[in-house]
């Protein structure tokens, strides 16, 4: 194993100093980015390429990670019917909790009413400010989304880094390998061997995470300023608190029912959470999350199917945001929505949140798609939250990430593909600390 000499050296030197852990470095980088962006905003905005470059580095390796994990996982299945079962159970879980997240956002908006009393005239809003997002939303459709899952070419799917297209091909290729049996054994062995250097490459790329988080946070604070939060603090606070309650109460209850602690899980994936906080991109944590879930005892085939699919279909944070933001706009502009209007909003959001998945700025675009179908709420009202959306995107991404981690463990347990002893050891901190960085290796 490549990591053996490194582990031996680490063991001989005793416990690592705290500052050598990735999560500490990312946390310091985020704090430094906030300070620099606040006191030197012009310099902060110029550091955007650092964050963009890191995201591109991670996206570069996502397709190989998904392909190797899914193809080898399915190829090793003795019962191919399991593939359909895992996918079906995952989609059932996604639909249930995505809908629940939408309903919770709707209820909270009605109870708290964060937009009440603003009395903004809809005619005074500038539709040009959100025209780009509205145009992108109109380009999306459910049929277009589903047909786009099928890649035009295999190379094109990998070149574009489209998660669902890569997943689609990987599943088919894994099934084909399983069906040819011994004839495909050499290919499976080769792919298994290729997994080690690919995950080592992920570990190398993760060392740049503090730089990416620093640049992204400096840009955000430098461009939008901490002061821009104050005017709409009620909406931001309501969204953050609702998301926290969803994670600790709803997902916490799911975790407890399935035999693990949500707090222990959050501690286990802390590096990935801080990475998302710094970059505002849940994709940045995808390779590390897949590796962590496999190390936690979830079968590779389950991890490979649930997490990439969940990145498009299990967006709990985005769903809470959509109904909450839609009702905020209605309240701010003095538009009364009947329960019938709100149910229509809920049904449209259930569809549009899937149809616009995987797009940059997906949360804002899916909101535009939803409002364009619901005539009661003006799409131009999105201009009210355009300036603060960037501050809510981190919370959306964090909630989405936790939701997918929980979903993976739950589906693995439903399929009897979860090593509970390994899960307990991982969540108890017995698998080593910095597994998303220097210690990252594919689980056996």
Curated annotation (Swiss-Prot):
What the entry lists under InterPro entries is as follows: C4_dicarb_transport (IPR023954), Na-dicarboxylate_symporter (IPR001991), Na-dicarboxylate_symporter_CS (IPR018107), Na:dicarbo_symporter_sf (IPR036458)
Q: Which GO terms describe its molecular function?
A: fumarate transmembrane transporter activity; malate:proton symporter activity; succinate transmembrane transporter activity
Superkingdom of the source? Bacteria
- Asked whether the keyword rRNA processing is assigned, the reply is no
**Keywords, sorted A to Z:** Cell inner membrane, Cell membrane, Membrane, Symport, Transmembrane, Transmembrane helix, Transport
The UniProt entry's GO CC annotations, sorted and at most eight, read: plasma membrane
User: Could you tell me the Gene Ontology terms of the biological process aspect for this record?
Assistant: L-aspartate transmembrane transport
- UniProt signal peptide: none
How this chain sits in the membrane, per its record, is: Multi-pass membrane protein
HAMAP family, per database record: C4_dicarb_transport
Indicate the family of this protein. Belongs to the dicarboxylate/amino acid:cation symporter (DAACS) (TC 2.A.23) family.
Q: Supply the NCBIfam families for this chain.
A: PRK01663.1, PRK13027.1
Q: What does this protein do?
A: Responsible for the transport of dicarboxylates such as succinate, fumarate, and malate from the periplasm across the inner membrane. This transport system plays an important role in the energy supply of rhizobium-legume symbionts.
Task: Cite the PANTHER family for this sequence.
Answer: AEROBIC C4-DICARBOXYLATE TRANSPORT PROTEIN (PTHR42865:SF1), PROTON/GLUTAMATE-ASPARTATE SYMPORTER (PTHR42865)
Q: What is this protein called?
A: C4-dicarboxylate transport protein
| The organism of origin for this protein | Rhizobium leguminosarum
| Name of encoding gene | dctA
């Amino acid at each position: 194993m490549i990591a053996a000499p490194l582990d031996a050296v680490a063991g001989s030197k005793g416990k690592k100093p705290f500052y050598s852990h990735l999560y500490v470095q990312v946390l310091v980088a985020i704090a430094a980015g906030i300070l620099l962006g606040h006191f030197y905003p012009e310099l902060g905005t110029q550091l955007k390429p650092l964050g963009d470059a890191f995201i591109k580095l991670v996206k570069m390796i996502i397709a190989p990670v998904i392909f190797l994990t899914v193809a080898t996982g399915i190829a090793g299945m003795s019962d191919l019917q399991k593939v359909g079962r895992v996918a079906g159970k995952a989609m059932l879980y996604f639909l249930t909790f995505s809908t629940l997240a939408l309903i919770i956002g709707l209820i909270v908006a009605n109870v708290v009413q964060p937009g009440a009393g603003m009395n903004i005239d809809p005619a005074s809003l500038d539709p040009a400010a959100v025209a780009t997002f509205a145009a992108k939303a109109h380009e999306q459709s459910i049929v277009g989304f589903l047909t786009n899952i099928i890649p035009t070419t295999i190379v094109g799917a990998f070149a574009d880094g489209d998660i669902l297209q890569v997943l689609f091909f990987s599943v088919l290729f894994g099934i084909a390998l399983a069906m040819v049996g011994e004839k495909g054994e050499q290919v499976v062995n080769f792919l298994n061997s290729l997994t080690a250097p690919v995950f080592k490459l992920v570990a190398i790329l993760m060392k740049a995470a503090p730089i990416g988080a620093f640049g992204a946070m400096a840009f955000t604070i430098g461009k939008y300023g901490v002061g821009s939060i104050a005017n709409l603090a009620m909406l931001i606070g309501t969204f953050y608190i609702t998301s926290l309650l969803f994670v600790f109460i709803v997902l916490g209850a799911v975790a407890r029912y399935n035999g693990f602690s949500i707090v222990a899980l959050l501690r286990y994936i802390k590096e990935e959470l801080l990475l998302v906080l710094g970059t505002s991109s849940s994709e940045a944590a995808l390779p590390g999350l897949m590796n962590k879930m496999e190390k936690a005892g979830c079968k590779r085939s389950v991890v490979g199917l649930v997490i990439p699919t969940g990145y498009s279909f299990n967006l709990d944070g985005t769903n809470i945001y959509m109904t909450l933001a839609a009702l905020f706009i209605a309240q701010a502009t003095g538009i009364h929505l009947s329960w019938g209007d709100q149910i229509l909003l809920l049904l449209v959001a259930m569809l549009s949140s899937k149809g616009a998945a995987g797009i940059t700025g997906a949360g804002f675009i899916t909101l535009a798609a939803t409002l364009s179908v619901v005539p009661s709420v003006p799409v131009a009202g999105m201009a009210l939250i355009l300036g603060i959306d960037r501050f809510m995107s981190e919370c959306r991404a964090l909630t989405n990430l936790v939701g997918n981690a929980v979903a993976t463990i739950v589906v693995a347990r439903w399929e009897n593909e979860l090593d509970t002893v390994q899960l307990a050891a991982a969540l108890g901190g017995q698998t080593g600390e910095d597994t998303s960085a220097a210690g990252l290796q594919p689980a056996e």
